[in-house]
From Swiss-Prot:
Coiled coil: none annotated. Binds 1 Mg(2+) ion per subunit. Monomer. It comes from Francisella tularensis subsp. holarctica (strain LVS). It catalyses: shikimate + ATP = 3-phosphoshikimate + ADP + H(+). One of its GO terms (molecular function) is shikimate kinase activity. This is Shikimate kinase. Pathway: Metabolic intermediate biosynthesis; chorismate biosynthesis; chorismate from D-erythrose 4-phosphate and phosphoenolpyruvate: step 5/7. InterPro entries: P-loop_NTPase, Shikimate/glucono_kinase, Shikimate_kinase/TSH1, Shikimate_kinase_CS. Its EC number is 2.7.1.71. GO terms for cellular component: cytosol.
């Protein structure tokens, strides 16, 4: 039996899913995919535009469809999901049943620091991001934890250190 090595990175905005995912994929010699990039490429517009036109519900539907398509077409990948991908029950089920789910945990302070100048995140187009981030974490943290095979704290850690922690976990789980 050929074992599929799918690794899914979940977590809040600013946790480093894309940055860590690229390095993890490079180290493990797997393909890296960012679901937000795939959505933008497929739709031909940026995520802000989709949110403005279709709202969050429309975006989440597209996100679920794209993740489902990726998992139907690809194996042996590192997939960085959007921070809210776990809001959809079908997406949670897909991720938890098709690979190892790594929850990259980040504090509100870290999220604020990493998103302070970012204008590409539709839910953070506000003057005071802290209350929004706090609300998002209150809603999403239980969902992240519910499907995570491992939780990796990203605060104060280097990308290399985080990648090594994930790799160690994957070896212990015999996925590598």
């Amino acid at each position: 039996m050929i074992r599929t090595k799918n690794i899914f990175l979940i977590g809040p905005v600013g946790a480093g899913k894309s940055t860590i995912g690229k390095q993890l994929a490079k180290q493990l010699k797997l393909e890296f995919i960012d679901s937000d990039d795939v959505i933008e490429k497929k739709c031909g517009v940026d995520i802000n535009w989709i949110f403005d036109l279709e709202g969050e519900e429309g975006f989440r539907k597209r996100e679920r469809e794209v993740i489902s398509e990726i998992l139907a077409e690809k194996q042996n990948i590192v997939l960085a999901t959007g921070g809210g991908a776990i809001l959809d029950p079908e997406t949670r089920s897909l991720l938890s049943s098709r690979g190892k789910v790594v929850y990259l945990e980040a504090t509100i302070e870290q999220q604020l620091e990493r998103t302070s100048k970012d204008t590409k995140r539709p839910l953070l187009r506000v003057d005071d991001k802290r209350p929004v981030l706090e609300q998002l974490m209150a809603e999403r943290e239980p969902l992240y934890r519910s499907i995570a095979d491992v939780v990796v704290e990203t605060n104060g850690a280097t990308v290399k250190n985080i990648v090594n922690k994930i790799s160690t976990f994957l070896v212990e789980e015999t996925i590598l």
